[in-house]
């Protein structure tokens, strides 16, 4: 059976009101991006309800890995370190994120598409764990250059009401109705990602000195 998988985002939940965040968690449009995704999810759901279109809303949490945009925090940290910088510029380091290696996210989409129990559902892809941005940065620093330190760059701070303070997703539903499971740990995923960025032909695509909005 053909299915329509709509890519949502954990950002639709906003700052967690409870954890782990399951699919029933209230939606909070804390940014224009999350607000538009909430709208897109609602339209997709309306097509399922009104026209029986075989729609599933897939909601991945924070995906990372090789080739990721420089706008994301992990490439931002890695590229600064590989450029030889010893002061790593970041925005807020207290928020938490639930981080998924890209292959696990992709496999989640595949398993959701294969399952006959997912039509009309909203499904998180998450690890059911969290780490602060600061602790994440320190993990990467310890691998590449333990002498580096984190400094706050005010330009990189989100507006206070827009910052998503905590993302910690529940993966109970996807584990129950599909054959998906997490195969790559955070530490393994970081190593694979750093290895990819460390290749000169890959690193040259990024400009560590430029803050990407």
What do the PLM-derived regions correspond to, one by one?
Residues 1-63, 192-198, 202, 206, ...:
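N-terminal Rossmann-like NAD(P)+-binding domain of SDR-like oxidoreductases, especially those catalyzing
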Residues 50, 80-84, 112-116, 177, ...:
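Generic structural signal for alpha-helix termini and adjacent loop/cap motifs
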Residues 77, 81, 106-113, 137-140, ...:
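Hydrophobic "lid"/C-terminal helical patch
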Residues 39, 43, 47, 77, ...:
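Hydrophobic alpha-helix immediately C-terminal to the catalytic Tyr-X-X-X-Lys motif of short-chain
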Residues 92, 121-123, 132-137, 145-166, ...:
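C-terminal "lid/loop" region of Rossmann-like NAD(P)-dependent oxidoreductases
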Residues 66-71, 94-106, 122-142, 183-185, ...:
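Substrate-binding strand-loop-helix patch
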Residues 38, 63-76, 83-86, 102-103, ...:
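Glycine/proline-rich active-site loop of Rossmann-fold NAD(P)-dependent oxidoreductases
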Residues 51-54, 78-89, 115, 143-155, ...:
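A short C-terminal helix-loop "cap" of Rossmann-like NAD(P)-dependent dehydrogenase/epimerase domains
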């Amino acid at each position: 059976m053909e299915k329509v998988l709509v890519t949502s985002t954990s950002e639709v939940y906003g700052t967690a009101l409870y954890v782990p965040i399951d699919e029933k968690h209230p939606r909070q449009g804390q940014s224009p991006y999350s607000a538009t995704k909430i709208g897109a999810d609602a339209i997709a759901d309306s097509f399922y309800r009104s026209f029986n279109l075989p729609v599933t809303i897939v909601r991945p949490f924070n995906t990372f890995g090789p080739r990721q945009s420089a706008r994301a925090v992990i490439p931002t940290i890695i590229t600064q370190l590989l450029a030889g910088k010893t002061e790593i510029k970041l925005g807020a380091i207290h928020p938490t994120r639930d981080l998924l290696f890209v292959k696990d996210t992709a496999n989640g989409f595949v398993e959701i598409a294969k399952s006959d129990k997912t039509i009309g559902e909203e499904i998180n892809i998450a690890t059911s764990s969290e780490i602060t941005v600061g602790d994440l940065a320190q993990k990467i620093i310890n691998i590449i250059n333990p002498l580096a330190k984190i400094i706050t760059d005010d330009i990189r701070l989100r507006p206070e009401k827009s910052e998503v303070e905590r993302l910690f997703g529940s993966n109970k539903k996807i584990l129950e109705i599909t054959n998906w499971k997490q195969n790559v740990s955070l530490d393994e995923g970081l190593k694979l990602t750093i290895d990819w960025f460390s290749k000169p032909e890959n690193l040259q695509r990024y400009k560590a000195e430029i803050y990407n909005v």
